């Protein structure tokens, strides 16, 4: 019986011995193509699997509604976000995790830096600055498309998914500011970027950021997600850890969510409203300062990145 194409490809890859590699210089173009091919297949599988899980979750949620669950209730909002996060992150964790485990022997080829003297605070304005400039790029492209082709205005995704009540606003804040950064850094900067690092740090950062931007699934968020992904990738490579990027990602999502949904997150009065308003004000200050500091921060990051101190061989 003739083997299927998938079985033939699987057999071919099982025969590859990466344990013999001692440095990145040992990787041949065919090896790099093979790694990228595997990641491409993993990406396709994760997208298809995501659609299947999403449809299943929709039917499950519809079953709860038919059973009497109010679509305006907090429980519905919690279930909606939970199911959405499961369908979004689970397929990518499984697909990219499989590639990560397969090429785990290549992890010892990762560049280890002796000098970790990056100034951590410059990443905060860099994060907000790149996000703001990414939004400006989207606005400019939208204007050009409207001018040349008469297309409609690109929908603001944050407005489209805006919570309708205080309770749903709290759920949105929890999932957007705390859940999403953890899973996204695990997927894109740990599983994906680490799998790509054998082909070079810079290509790994750019490709992982590109996939991170595309994974948002809409044009409105692509530019700033891509630029933000570059910052998170720089941090993951520079510190050999996803924790700093995860913290910065959390800070960014927290302030963006509070600023965007300030109205929905307030209204109960007292200390809570004061804290939310203060956080929104602080976020606006950081965003405005970062916006004008963007060119200087970009230059500082570029200079720092090109002066990495590599360990010398004995």
Question: Where are the regions that the model predicts?
Answer:
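Membrane-interface segments at the starts/ends of alpha-helical transmembrane spans
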Residues: 68-84, 159-167, 268-292
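N-terminal juxtamembrane cytosolic/stromal segments of multi-pass membrane proteins
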Residues: 1-36
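Conserved small/polar residues in nucleotide/adenosyl-binding loops
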Residues: 306-312
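Juxtamembrane helix-loop-helix connectors linking adjacent transmembrane helices
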Residues: 2, 63-79, 112-180, 197
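Functionally important transmembrane alpha-helices
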Residues: 51-52, 214, 221-287
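Hydrophobic core of alpha-helical transmembrane segments in multi-pass integral membrane proteins
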Residues: 92-98, 291-305
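Alpha-helical transmembrane segments in multi-pass membrane proteins
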Residues: 46-102
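Function-critical hydrophobic alpha-helical transmembrane segments in multi-pass membrane proteins
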Residues: 133, 158-218, 222, 227
């Amino acid at each position: 019986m003739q083997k299927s194409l998938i079985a033939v490809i699987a057999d071919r890859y099982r025969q590859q011995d990466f344990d013999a590699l001692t440095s990145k210089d040992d990787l041949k173009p065919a090896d790099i193509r093979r790694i990228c091919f595997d990641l491409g297949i993993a990406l396709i599988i994760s997208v298809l699997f995501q659609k299947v899980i999403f449809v299943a979750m929709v039917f499950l949620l519809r079953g709860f509604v038919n059973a009497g669950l109010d679509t305006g209730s907090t429980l519905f909002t919690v279930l909606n976000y939970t199911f959405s996060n499961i369908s979004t992150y689970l397929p990518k964790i499984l697909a990219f995790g499989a590639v990560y485990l397969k090429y785990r022997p290549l992890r010892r080829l990762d560049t280890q830096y002796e000098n970790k003297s990056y100034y951590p605070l410059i990443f905060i304005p860099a994060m907000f600055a790149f996000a703001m400039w990414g939004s400006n790029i989207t606005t400019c492209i939208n204007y050009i498309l409207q001018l040349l082709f008469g297309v409609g205005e690109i929908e603001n995704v944050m407005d489209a998914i805006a919570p309708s009540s205080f309770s749903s606003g709290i759920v949105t804040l929890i999932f957007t500011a705390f859940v999403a950064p953890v899973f996204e850094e695990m997927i894109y900067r740990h599983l994906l970027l680490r799998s790509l690092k054998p082909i070079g740090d810079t290509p790994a950062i750019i490709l992982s950021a590109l996939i991170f931007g595309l994974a948002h699934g809409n044009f409105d968020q692509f530019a700033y997600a891509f630029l933000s992904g570059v910052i998170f990738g720089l941090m993951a490579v520079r510190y050999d850890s996803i924790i700093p990027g995860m913290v910065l990602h959390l800070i960014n999502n927290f302030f963006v969510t509070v600023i965007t949904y300030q109205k929905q997150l307030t209204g109960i009065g007292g200390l809570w409203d004061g804290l939310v308003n203060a956080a929104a004000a602080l976020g606006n200050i950081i965003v405005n300062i970062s916006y004008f500091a963007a060119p200087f921060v970009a230059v500082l990051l570029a200079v720092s990145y090109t002066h990495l101190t590599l360990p010398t061989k004995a």
